[in-house]
């Protein structure tokens, strides 16, 4: 009987640790900005909290971000080992250079791994980036000779895919980004989720339903407390005219989209919910305005998080 009680107590302890405060994910931002500063462009290493098997969400900046992360204590090994051993693959949201240039520049020093993206993004890698006129073909498709370091994995919308050599899976969703298809990645580890959005404009301006459909998928996960955070861009302050957003969000439009999400997930469901604000565009005065405007418009009481390059975040 005592043995049964001990087993029961151990189970309850494990369950309570899981239910109250145990972290599911760690995020190491390698780059957090949306332009100009080539040393700090969109890239976020993501892994289960107890693992060093990371996937990189976009790859605008790699080496500089890894060095910053080492300086801030996120990693205890040399930068080249983080690149070669810890990053197991890349989820690329779309084909704009500020989201993948770090991957290209670091490719000679990298190890064999997968690049996951929608078909049109992978086609751009094949025909524009990993070619012998612009760089070298480090992939196993496209121009010859092929150096076969990277393998392309085409993602299908709303289809779960294993992220190889990690404990995570991903579902990709199309997003509207002006004249280009971007993507959102819903990453799962055990029974927890985190959502990362590449560049995206509001449905109303983009004449799209992509965010609406995405929020419909997220609402049940929010209700069940399984979605730990949404990482979403706010590129410009509210002073930016709608006609020159070019497929991006402002504080006003982010909060409009969050209102739409809360209508689906239930009143009060987003209070203290983690929103990681990504892709803020310099200059610093604009970034300061974005933060002030988001604070003023935060009627839903979201937990707004502004990632810092190299500083790990736990969810």
Where do the PLM segments sit?
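Active-site HxH/HxHxD metal-binding segment of metal-dependent hydrolases
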Residues: 77-145
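Catalytic core of the metallo-beta-lactamase
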Residues: 47, 154-223
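Cap/insert and terminal regions of metallo-dependent hydrolase folds
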Residues: 203-308
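Metallo-beta-lactamase
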Residues: 24, 30, 120-182, 190, ...
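Zn-dependent metallo-beta-lactamase
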Residues: 2-54, 61-63
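Divalent metal-coordination and catalytic microenvironments
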Residues: 27, 44, 58, 94, ...
């Amino acid at each position: 009987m005592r043995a049964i009680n001990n087993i029961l107590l151990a189970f309850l302890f494990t369950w309570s640790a899981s239910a109250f405060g145990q972290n599911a994910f760690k995020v190491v931002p390698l780059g957090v900005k949306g332009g100009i500063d080539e040393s700090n462009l969109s890239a976020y290493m993501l892994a289960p909290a107890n693992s060093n098997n990371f996937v990189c969400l976009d790859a605008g900046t790699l080496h500089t971000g890894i060095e910053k992360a080492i300086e801030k204590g996120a990693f205890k090994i040399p930068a080249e080992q983080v690149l070669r051993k810890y990053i197991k693959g890349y989820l690329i949201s779309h084909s704009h250079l500020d989201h993948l240039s770090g991957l290209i520049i670091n490719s000679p020093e990298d190890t064999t791994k997968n690049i996951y993206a929608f078909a049109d993004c992978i086609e751009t890698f094949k025909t524009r980036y990993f070619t012998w006129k612009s760089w070298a073909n480090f992939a196993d498709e496209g121009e010859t000779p092929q150096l076969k370091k990277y393998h392309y994995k085409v993602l299908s919308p709303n289809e779960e895919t294993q992220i190889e050599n990690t404990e995570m899976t991903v579902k990709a969703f199309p997003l509207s980004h002006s004249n280009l298809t971007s993507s959102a990645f819903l990453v799962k580890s055990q029974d927890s989720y985190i959502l990362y959005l590449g560049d995206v404009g509001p449905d109303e301006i983009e004449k799209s339903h992509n965010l609406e459909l995405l929020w419909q998928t997220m609402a049940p996960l929010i209700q069940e407390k399984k979605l730990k955070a949404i990482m979403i861009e706010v590129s410009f302050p509210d002073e930016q005219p709608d006609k020159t957003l070019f497929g991006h969000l402002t504080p006003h439009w982010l909060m409009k989209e969050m209102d739409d999400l809360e209508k689906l997930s239930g009143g009060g469901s987003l209070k203290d919910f983690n929103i990681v604000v990504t892709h803020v565009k310099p200059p610093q005065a604009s970034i300061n305005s974005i933060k002030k405007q988001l604070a003023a418009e935060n009627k839903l009481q979201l937990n707004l998080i502004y990632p810092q390059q190299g500083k790990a975040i736990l969810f």
